Amino acid sequence: MLIDTHAHVNFKAFENDFDEVIKRSLGEDVWMINVGSKYETSKKAVEIAQNYNNGVFAAIGLHPIHAQDEEFDKERYKKLALSGSEWSDKVVAIGEIGLDKFKDYGSFLKEQKEVFLKQLDLAKELNLPIIIHCRMAHEDLIKELRIKNYELRIRGVIHCFTGTWEEAKKYLDLGFYIGINGIIYKRDLKEVIKKAPLEKILIETDCPYLTPPQAESERNEPIFVRYIAKDIARIKGIDFKTVSQTTFQNAIDLFNL
């Protein structure tokens, strides 16, 4: 069993065949968490999760790059998470949320921080973990998390980690998991993968983006998360089964699946 802990089958790239993609993944024992980036994609993630008895879950949240063009309405997101008992066990995290200073996004970092802190409060209120997006903003993010972690006892994962081992260690010391995906084929993360405890690693695709080259496909899919697991096993010098079993259990533990 494998879990793609960060997928976007709820995005437009899958609008014509998301059911086929999901059934293909479930048929190969690959579960998934579809992650929202705005209210509409969050709603879509929940609606998709509703259609499956098991193996398909949702995360809801406002991505930092949208902090300027969409107002975060806490009550609206809360209602989305709690609308009916059949939904509440499908929404397993608040995300993806965080900070992004790439290109011009840093020009509204203040608004990003305000939205981020509001979503931390929502996660605490709903007793849900968070899925964090961080790009070129580790110092700012770690500072915010250290302040709020003491107050809120936040738990979660740093999605698509691209930082140094020193930065990874700071997140690990705060109790966070490290999310590893196809970015490993573009960035050298061998030191992070070698040194991070397997018990604190989650695997993901970020599909439809960051397709592993082995997949020989333009569009990434949850089923390709197996390539990430195989390369983690190779880098750590352990067997694939250990990686799949441990990261599966890690996801169960963090997201209470």
Where does each model-flagged region fall?
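Mid-domain alpha/beta scaffold segments of enzyme catalytic cores
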Residues: 1-257
